[in-house]
Amino acid sequence: MITFRWFGPRDPIPLGYIRQIPAVRGIVGALFDIPVGEPWPLDRIESLREEVERNGMALSVVESIPVHEDIKLGLSGRDRLIDNYCESVRNLGRAGVPVLCYNFMPVFDWTRTDLARRLDDESTALAYDDNALGKIDLSRGTADLPGWATAYTADALRKLLDAYRSVNAEKLWENFAFFLQRVVPVAAESGVRMALHPDDPPWSIFGLPRIITDGAALERVTTIVDEQANGITFCAGSLAADPKNDLPEIARCLGKKGRIHFAHCRNIKRTGNRSFQETPHPSEFGDVDMRAVLSALRQTGFSGPIRSDHGRMIWDEQGQPGYGLHDRALGAMYLHGLWEGIGGDPAHA
């Protein structure tokens, strides 16, 4: 099923526009006003699902329910926070939402250093440069970090970064395992498939540990709780930022185990060591062989939701960087056509 991210009532792109993209049958949505760590009310999830259904589509994925930093840090209050997370997962199941995409990145979610990199065709795209990141002064909070300007005050960020000084990669794995061992059984009982998103970019930033960076890490996740509900989001763009990652092989290995529950299929072009920019979706424009990736997914019997993920800003569109309508719609149609062309059932793309 081809899906499309929608940011709810605040999104300048209405559901009525999205339903006009011929291949799109599902919406990837979330509740954005629930404080991190608080349970998501069933009635709110049902209202979101009903709004999507009124527009002729299904609420296929929730992306995401954020994991509280105290859980990642392994602090004493994590038990209550994990209980709340489990209640949210139960409510997803009660509301009939089959997939939950989430991540375990400390402090920062996906990170870029440029939200409007000018490409040769005069479109703009998201980009990342590790050298540029190193020049960002966090003593002012996140004011200078693109996309994170109002996320943390200087004092709040300092305290959080200080707390992570005692958390190395293995400690973060330990805390993640504790979380999975509590949440995955609840997800399995509730009919919800957990789909962990890889770290983006797939390396440490600002001295913080990042552990979900390659195929071996994703395999390790699936062994912590050996349950079909414990799976991943296969994000081509995130994994491709590291040239050592063999995307088709990762897709085959995890797909054979039935652990790929969601796919983000976007393209990137590596522009140097630990630097990249996002590109149009077709293979020729970046470093992702999209045909090979989708072929690998199809060979394993994957029939889950796929989304075109980020897009460029084209045709003078204004909006949230990476999440305009036009280029993501082009990407959705490209992915749908590619899936059909390699022999996949169009009804499941």
Region annotations inferred by a language model:
Residues 91-95, 99-177:
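Active-site-proximal, glycine-rich beta->alpha crossover segments in alpha/beta enzymes
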